[in-house]
């Protein structure tokens, strides 16, 4: 595998390649070498950041012999919003094989500069203006080469984090005899090929729900309104939402799913997390809701059965110490088929997918929430409901035998399996943000406040890697009563846990920050920011909008900021103790815990706002010592 990255100028272009050992860089004068390199490595996998939408297109145009001026024209078109598919069709680029793995494929969009920040690398932006209307000087070329090598290395680090995903994709290609070009396809496209989907345009997209397809039994008239919302209509209304009280918890009912939770809630004692195993896939099978666009609808249940069989085989071989007897494809297949199975439901809602079947996707989502309401209704006399989400519920069981009996009846009726995880603590801000401690001591953190708690244990690179230390402090206080002061000062943390990677958007032309009372422009549009201890020297980070000459503050940052765009891998807080304001992070943890646990009516406000008083109220509410 190799990473590649292009730098495009008005009268020059640079093609950079890195294979993990050496950098290869070609300028436009080296077109023959570029073509020769491509011929030698055209069967390799080429990895790039956003390469599917940019680099792969321009690289193929270079191979066709386009001039630097023409390449720049195409580059500007793409940057300004032209659809790359149009360029591909017009120039017949699909005829040039390039096995491109786009790092951003099926991922949340983020820039390479943000990735460099998340990874702890130096955040390096070009010193050479891409819009220079002349040939580059020797010095400018050297600066561009240096910048290009930096980006290639950063992309290589990203690729290493996706190595298993690449192996899984190659295993699926081998198992189903797909063309190698499918390495560049989305998960939905690969899934559509494996399941032999056929592009379809069903006319019944918003057809009212047919309650006869599933054994839904809802007796409570109030709860029954959820069923009526989807049946008593001429067509399904995607914008309509229904709010009803179910088991003492306000729920929102909509096409996409069921959501309800006790807000700012905590409980210590026996808790059950009751989830439906593989909810959507099993509903598709049990209630005949597979995509009607599949040539052979029986393919989907076969895939599900195949995954269970290969998963069992792999686990058995590994447990017996016979892992070396498994092929690489077999080892990857449980994960590959899980990806296929879990991709289908989303593909059914995607208009240009071969599995597109909007009606069955709607009915599947509706069936799922109605069956959960059915389950809650039957359990209600024997439990307290904590929350409901798309595929499961959290409950406090008061009569465990009765709860188990109703769960078994529901399973027998639906043919679905409920997986019960017993826990001992839950702290819940709302349906999207909670911390659940399991009976075995394991922790499930969900939502923007706490999801980064275990980033360092789940791989180096995460798409969202800002202020990890806050997530650590919130979870450790809620579950273990660890004071935020101890969290911050009791460990010599790696510095990246305190970083805020901030990138200004395209509507802004410049970035700066306050130093000694002066606004100092920064060369970077993306910066790694920390709370600054020296409050007299450092101030806000600023941005300037296109067409204006005044500075605005960059949002969600401290009053006093210190920018460090250097490589901070291996750097500890103790190394910068004179620069970083640890008290700010401690107070931010407290502020977020207040937000997590206190209702608006329970907090101080306006002129009377006091973090100290809010923090005291948190401790009282949670029964902690003051």
Please provide the spans of the model-predicted regions.
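Short active-site loop/helix that positions an aromatic residue
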Residues: 15, 53-65, 277-291
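Helical catalytic core of nucleic-acid polymerases
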Residues: 98, 107-112, 122, 127-139, ...
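Entry/capping segment at the start of metal-dependent catalytic domains
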Residues: 1-16, 23
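Two-metal-ion RNase H-like nuclease active-site motif
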Residues: 1-8, 100-102, 272-274
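Conserved "right-hand" nucleotidyltransferase catalytic core of DNA-directed polymerases
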Residues: 7, 118-126, 132-282, 362, ...
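C-terminal, non-catalytic extensions of nucleic-acid polymerases
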Residues: 334, 401-626
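A residue-level signal for conserved active-site and pocket-lining positions in enzyme catalytic cores
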Residues: 48, 116, 151, 155, ...
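Conserved DEDDh/DEDDy metal-dependent 3′-5′ exonuclease domain
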Residues: 21-114, 147
């Amino acid at each position: 595998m190799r990473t590649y990255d292009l730098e495009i100028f008005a009268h020059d272009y640079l093609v950079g390649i890195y294979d993990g050992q050496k950098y290869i860089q070609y300028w436009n004068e080296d077109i023959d070498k570029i073509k020769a390199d491509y011929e030698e490595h055209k069967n390799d996998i080429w990895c790039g950041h956003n390469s599917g939408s940019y680099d792969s297109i321009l690289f193929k145009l270079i191979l066709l012999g386009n001039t630097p001026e023409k390449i720049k024209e195409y580059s500007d078109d793409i940057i300004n919003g032209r659809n790359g598919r149009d360029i591909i069709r017009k120039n017949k680029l699909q005829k040039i094989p390039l096995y491109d793995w786009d790092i951003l494929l099926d991922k949340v969009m983020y820039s390479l500069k943000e990735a460099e920040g998340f990874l702890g690398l130096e955040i390096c932006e070009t010193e050479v203006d891409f819009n220079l209307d002349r040939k580059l000087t020797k010095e400018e070329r050297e600066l561009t080469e240096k910048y290009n090598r930096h980006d290639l290395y950063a992309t290589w680090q990203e690729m290493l984090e996706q190595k298993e995903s690449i192996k899984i994709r190659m295993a699926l290609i081998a198992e189903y005899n797909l063309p190698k070009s499918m390495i560049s396809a989305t998960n939905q496209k690969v899934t559509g090929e494996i399941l032999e989907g056929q592009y379809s345009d069903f006319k019944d997209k918003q057809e009212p729900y047919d309650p006869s397809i599933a054994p839904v039994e809802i007796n409570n008239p109030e709860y029954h309104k959820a069923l009526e919302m989807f049946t008593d209509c001429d067509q399904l209304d995607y914008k309509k939402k229904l709010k009803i009280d179910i088991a003492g918890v306000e729920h929102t009912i909509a096409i996409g799913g069921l959501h309800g939770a006790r807000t700012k809630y905590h409980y210590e004692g026996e808790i059950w997390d009751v989830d439906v195993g593989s909810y959507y896939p099993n509903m598709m099978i049990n209630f005949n809701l597979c995509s009607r666009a599949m040539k052979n609808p029986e393919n989907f249940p076969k895939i599900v059965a195949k995954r269970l069989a290969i998963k069992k085989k792999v686990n058995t071989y590994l447990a017996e110490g016979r892992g070396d007897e498994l092929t690489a494809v077999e080892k990857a297949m449980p994960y590959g088929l899980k990806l296929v199975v879990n991709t289908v439901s989303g593909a059914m809602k995607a208009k240009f997918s071969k599995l597109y079947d909007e009606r069955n996707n709607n009915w599947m989502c509706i069936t799922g929430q109605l069956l959960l309401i059915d389950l809650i209704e039957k359990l209600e006399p024997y439990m307290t409901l904590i929350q409901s989400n798309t595929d499961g519920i959290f409950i406090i069981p008061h009569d465990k035998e009765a709860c188990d009996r109703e769960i078994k009846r529901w399973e027998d009726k639906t043919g679905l399996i409920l997986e019960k995880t017993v826990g001992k603590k839950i702290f819940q801000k709302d349906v999207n943000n909670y911390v659940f401690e399991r009976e075995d001591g394991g922790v499930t953190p969900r939502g923007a406040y706490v999801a980064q708690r275990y980033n360092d244990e789940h791989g180096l690179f995460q798409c969202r890697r800002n202020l990890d230390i806050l997530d650590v402090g919130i979870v450790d206080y809620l579950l273990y009563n660890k004071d935020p002061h101890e969290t911050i000062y009791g460990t010599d943390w790696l510095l990246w846990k305190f970083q805020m990677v901030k990138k200004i958007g395209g509507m802004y032309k410049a970035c700066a920050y306050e130093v000694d009372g002066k606004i100092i422009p920064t060369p970077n549009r993306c910066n790694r920011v920390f709370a600054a201890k020296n409050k007299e020297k450092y101030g806000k980070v600023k941005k300037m909008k296109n067409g204006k000459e005044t500075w605005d503050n960059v949002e969600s940052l401290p009053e006093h900021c210190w920018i460090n765009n250097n490589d901070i891998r291996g750097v500890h807080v103790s190394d910068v103790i004179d620069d970083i304001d640890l008290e700010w992070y401690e107070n931010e943890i407290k502020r977020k815990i207040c937000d997590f646990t206190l209702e608006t009516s329970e907090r101080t406000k306006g002129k009377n706002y006091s973090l100290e008083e809010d923090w005291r109220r948190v401790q009282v509410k949670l029964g902690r010592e003051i």
